[in-house]
């Protein structure tokens, strides 16, 4: 279902994105670029952002509805944060694409969840990259949900 599947975000390079014809990168928040519910970015994530921000428009698209949590995120990074995105509903992603005056095919949606992140990208007409969690030490319920999602997706 995803156009690309990678171990984590750090495998995404500017060259790869340029070769894909991408001008904007929309990123899921929890478990994709930030350890889930931590409210903090890893130092290597900030370094990765630095490699991308000069060539690409970057935005965070999250289903998170906690205003304190998204406030922390907005303070920590200089990118647009679209909260309460209601993924996989593509409405907010399409609105953001329109706002930045790009074509859907110039955007890539990156996330760790096939049934939310990848589907929203597909519904909005963007390219998609499915990545593994940024956290190798996820709790058991999260690991089970992730395995079930990926198992279901393999059948489509």
PLM features per residue range, with description:
Residues 1-27, 34, 38-39, 43-57, ...:
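Asp-based, Mg2+/Mn2+-dependent phosphohydrolase catalytic module
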């Amino acid at each position: 279902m995803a156009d690309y599947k990678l171990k984590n975000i750090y495998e995404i390079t500017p060259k790869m994105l340029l070769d894909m014809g991408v001008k904007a990168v929309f990123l899921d928040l929890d478990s994709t670029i930030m350890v889930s519910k931590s409210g903090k970015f890893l130092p290597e994530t900030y370094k990765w952002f630095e490699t991308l921000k000069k060539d690409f428009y970057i935005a965070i698209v999250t289903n998170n509805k906690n205003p304190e949590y998204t406030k922390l995120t907005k303070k920590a990074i200089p990118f647009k944060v679209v909260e309460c995105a209601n993924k996989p509903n593509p409405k907010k992603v399409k609105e953001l694409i329109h706002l930045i005056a790009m074509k859907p095919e110039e955007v890539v949606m990156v996330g760790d969840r096939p049934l939310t992140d990848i589907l929203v990208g597909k519904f909005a007409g963007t390219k998609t990259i499915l990545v593994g969690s940024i956290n190798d030490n996820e709790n058991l319920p999260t690991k089970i949900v992730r395995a079930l999602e990926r198992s279901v997706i393999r059948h489509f």
